[in-house]
Amino acid sequence: MKETRRRKLWMLAAILIICCLLGFVWFQTKVVNTRADEEAVFIPQAPDYSDATMWVTANADAEGDGADIFYMVSTWEEDWTTEDGRVCHYADVWNVRHREHMAREINKVAAYMSHEHPESSENGDGKGKNRFHAPYYRHATIETFMMHSEDSIRSRTRLAMRDVCAAFDLFQAQRDTTRPLILAGFSQGGLAVVELLKHIDDETYRQLAAAYVLGYKVTPEDTLNCKHIKAAQGETDTGVTICYNTVKDVKYIQPVIAATCMGINPVNWRTDATPATLHDTITVTLSPEYHVLVVSGYSGAEYPAYKNFLNVGDIHSCEPWLYSECLAKNIRVRADAWRMKNPRQNNNP
């Protein structure tokens, strides 16, 4: 009896030892494979935001009565390979060609955000001029979003969001904080706006006139985890988030980008289904159920489909451009509304 029990104990001990050895071998193999994967992936050098090369800026606000705009560019790069064969999932801010790609969008946005379009100014008083800053950052490549995995997107974009927060902290430390603050971004830049709202402290939030999430989503989890994210309800409210995504029909919503819990029509600033007319021929209607803009009278043909992922019933690429006059005017309106609520700040240049 005792001998049988002793044998069972030895067998159990042997099994435990074998399991431990197998676990150790598995762990070592995983570590080796992980290191090999890391060595095969290239991470670009971090930006130095004290270097003017890392920024696009425009200062049209000579009078000092405008807003400070911090803009985050969208996704411009696909996965690419270094000369030594390593794949990279990020834009390289030290690569001149990559900066040129980002600058195409940034300069076009700066043209209307830093200086309100004259046709959108009702009284032609020349106001609506702003100070515009946009950092180059190591944005994740488009393949990140084409994986259709929220976990993968969150993991891959973590580096990009660190860059954005570092750039913003320097921008915030150097700017005149008595001026209204505008955050804006398109696509992955819209994601960056959401993450910045989580990053900023309450004092910085009090300086916020508005945050514009163009062509990206705000999730219920985002709103639960961040008291700074408050959906805009009209044209003049401040400290709010403006979010919109454009589709031809709600069936074309791209979930990883546009499955949002908030939305507003940037043409009439309504959150219901009241239609608005844009450029005389385009009808823009918000879907209160899906919080996206459904357009008719506009094909978006100038934006070809991208790998059956974007611009395939959605019109993702139009977001900063189709409504540019509406956005330029609204930035002015919300900045003025912020100044009305903060009169003690108004005498500062």
Q: What are these regions, as identified by a protein language model?
A:
Residues 31-33, 72-179, 301-318, 324-349:
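Active-site catalytic motif of lipid deacylating hydrolases and related acyltransferases
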Residues 78, 141, 190, 220, ...:
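Flexible, glycine-rich phosphate/dinucleotide-binding loops
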Residues 185-189, 193:
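Gly/Ala-rich beta-loop-alpha elbow adjacent to hydrolase catalytic centers
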Residues 2-113, 120-124:
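Flexible, membrane-associating and regulatory peripheral segments of lipid-active enzymes
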Residues 5, 23-28, 35, 163-177, ...:
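Surface cap/lid and interfacial helix-loop subdomains adjacent to catalytic sites
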Residues 81, 144-146, 192-197, 221-225:
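A short acidic (Asp/Glu
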Residues 72-75, 136-140, 186-187, 213-217, ...:
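Active-site-proximal beta-strand/loop segments in catalytic clefts of secreted hydrolases
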Residues 65-67, 128-132, 177-180, 206-210:
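Loop/turn elements at helix/coil->beta-strand transitions in domains of secreted/extracellular proteins
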